């Protein structure tokens, strides 16, 4: 049964009680006025009023009470009818209330200390504090940056935010996608100067990269499944998707082999090279179903020792396929893993130096350098990001009680070119609470839709901040114009009629106009950008001037002597520092012959 809100029922009607009491006094005045008819009483009404109001006590005469109640009901009914039929006017907002944001609008979201903010534009910033005193001003740190080629995505946004590395209140690690390899050259020195550990993964030249082994981050059966899912999602090519059967069959085989490698192989053999060797050794004879290749024998031996082993169960499902089918599956696997036949790539993934699970422990800057023209090896970068998100979320939950001590910002330039990150739409919705943020840099929003299909809108919806730096892609311009809304403007028209007599007319009216139309967005000034922050009016502001940043003087853009030398860094990276922690092993060589 619905409860009656007594307070809401009584309080609005209290004024009418006083009206009723006042009406009883007026009725009493008329009743006490001298005279026998109405006209005489009205002439002597003042005498009646003086007599009635001589005492402020309401009249309880039956006639007066009836008049008071009737008056209160009549006025209450009139107010009710008036309210129902009232016209709703919004002066100067008739066709829309859109406007540009001001300094007062952004003020609640900015930290007083410059270094504790994310740089959005020249005049707008967003605090790194994910739990501000006023909860209604809390915003996630996910940012969507859209700008055509040459709009300054790197210079006006990415580099300034990378230089926000001096905060002691909110320490931050960075994961930066560096398509041309010039961001680390420009900003690497400034980061090192502020205590950052630099790490580099390079898919352009494997010899000039630190080693990355996805197998090093497998700790459980679910990690194996995650790795296989990522591998398949990012090596499927651009053609029409094949039969789902073959993908599932490949998944079974990869899961079985990687499970065997993880649980049974020595640590130094837990890599893609071993996986390739396994597949190469899996000979299948269509005319001999009972033939056993070396891998079959290895799994038979493992089954005898551990019949319930995870890898054994997966391999048994794969072996249900007939000889011809199994051969087709192996061919498909060989084609998918063809890049790992390159010796340099096998060397790159032989062991791990990136230590992705430590980015939330101490200030680190991981630069992922990739080609902006060739995406052959971009699947490796996507695997890196997928494992990074999973590892950091698990560590935040299992070790740090839900929040990493060092916030990890992923600045993903050319986000559409690194390949698909599985479940990104779910990750961007959940990583905020773990002190992780994801910033996607695109040339057009259509790139995101092409890669993530229906999930693209979910990803954009979980970006509390979006910045448009300029561009001409029609879909992006149309969506932005609609999001900015309409403002109400004044229109002044003049008319002139000519005939026997000349007449003139003037007409003033209100009209609705888009805050910025599609054609206006297409010719947006190169120094301007549009910022949208959830719950705040949009801002039309200047792009951030990199030369105004306090750390600009330590970048290669300011002076070439501060250029970060990648080759020199990689050649000296194994030199130990006094505070480095290392594992020491003691070996007994007493039985060895003396050289």
Sequence positions of predicted segments:
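Compositionally biased amphipathic helical and low-complexity segments enriched in hydrophobic
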Residues: 7-10, 121, 442, 516, ...
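Basic- and hydrophobic-enriched, low-structure N-terminal and domain-boundary segments
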Residues: 1-151, 155-163, 168-170, 486, ...
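P-loop NTPase motor domains
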Residues: 22-28, 126, 133-436, 451, ...
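Conserved ATP-driven motor cores of ASCE-family P-loop NTPases powering translocation/secretion/packaging/pilus
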Residues: 428-530
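Short, surface-exposed polybasic-aromatic patches that bind anionic ligands, especially phosphate groups
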Residues: 545
């Amino acid at each position: 049964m619905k409860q009656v809100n007594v307070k809401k029922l009584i309080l609005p009607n209290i004024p009418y009680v006083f009206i009723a009491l006042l009406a009883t006094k007026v009725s009493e005045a008329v009743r006490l006025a001298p005279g026998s008819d109405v006209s005489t009483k009205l002439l002597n009404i003042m005498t009646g009023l003086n007599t009635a109001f001589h005492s402020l006590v309401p009249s309880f005469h039956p006639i007066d009470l009836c008049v008071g109640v009737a008056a209160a009901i009549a006025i209450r009914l009139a107010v009710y009818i008036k309210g129902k039929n009232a016209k709703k006017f919004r002066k100067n907002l008739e066709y829309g209330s859109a406007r540009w944001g001001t300094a007062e609008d952004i003020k609640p979201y900015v930290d007083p200390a410059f270094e504790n903010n994310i740089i959005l534009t020249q005049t707008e910033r967003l605090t790194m504090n994910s739990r501000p005193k006023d909860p209604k001003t809390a915003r996630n740190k996910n940012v969507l940056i859209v700008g055509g080629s040459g709009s300054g995505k790197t210079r006006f946004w990415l580099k300034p935010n990378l230089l926000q590395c001096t905060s002691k209140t909110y320490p931050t690690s960075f994961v930066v996608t560096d398509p041309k390899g010039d961001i680390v050259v420009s900003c690497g020195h400034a980061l090192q100067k502020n205590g950052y550990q630099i790490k580099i993964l390079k898919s352009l030249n494997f010899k000039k990269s630190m080693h990355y082994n996805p197998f090093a981050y497998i700790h459980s059966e679910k990690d194996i499944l995650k790795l296989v899912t990522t591998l398949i999602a990012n090596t499927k090519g651009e053609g029409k998707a094949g039969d789902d059967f073959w993908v599932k069959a490949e998944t079974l085989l990869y899961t079985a082999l990687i499970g065997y490698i993880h649980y049974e192989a020595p640590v130094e053999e837990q890599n893609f090279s071993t996986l390739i060797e396994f597949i190469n050794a899996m000979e299948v004879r269509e005319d001999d179903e009972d033939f056993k290749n070396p891998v079959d024998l290895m799994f038979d031996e493992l089954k005898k020792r551990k019949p319930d082993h995870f890898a054994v169960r997966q391999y048994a499902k794969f072996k249900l396929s007939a000889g011809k089918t199994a051969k087709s599956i192996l061919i498909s696997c060989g084609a998918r893993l063809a890049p790992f036949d390159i010796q340099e790539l096998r060397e790159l993934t032989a062991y791990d130096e990136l230590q992705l699970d430590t980015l939330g422990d101490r200030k680190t800057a991981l630069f992922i350098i990739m080609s902006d023209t060739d995406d052959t090896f971009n699947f490796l970068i996507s695997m890196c990001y997928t494992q990074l998100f999973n590892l950091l979320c698990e560590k935040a939950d299992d070790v740090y009680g839900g929040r990493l001590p060092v916030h990890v910002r992923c600045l993903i330039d050319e986000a559409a070119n690194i390949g698909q990150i599985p479940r990104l739409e779910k990750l961007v919705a959940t990583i905020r609470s773990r002190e992780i943020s994801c910033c996607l840099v695109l040339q057009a929003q259509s790139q995101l839709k092409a890669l993530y299909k229906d999930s693209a809108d979910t990803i954009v919806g979980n970006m509390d901040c979006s910045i448009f730096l300029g561009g001409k892609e029609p879909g992006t311009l149309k969506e932005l114009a609609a999001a900015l809304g309409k403002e109400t403007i004044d229109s002044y028209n003049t008319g002139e009629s000519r005939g026997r007599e000349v007449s003139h007319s003037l007409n003033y009216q209100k009209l609705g106009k888009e805050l910025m139309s599609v054609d206006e967005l297409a010719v947006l000034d190169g120094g301007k950008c549009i910022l949208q922050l959830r719950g705040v009016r949009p801002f039309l502001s200047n792009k951030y001037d990199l030369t105004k940043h306090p750390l600009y003087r330590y970048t290669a853009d300011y002076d070439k002597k501060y250029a970060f030398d990648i080759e020199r860094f990689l050649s000296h990276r194994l030199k130990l520092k006094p505070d480095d922690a290392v594992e020491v092993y003691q070996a007994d060589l007493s039985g060895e012959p003396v050289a």
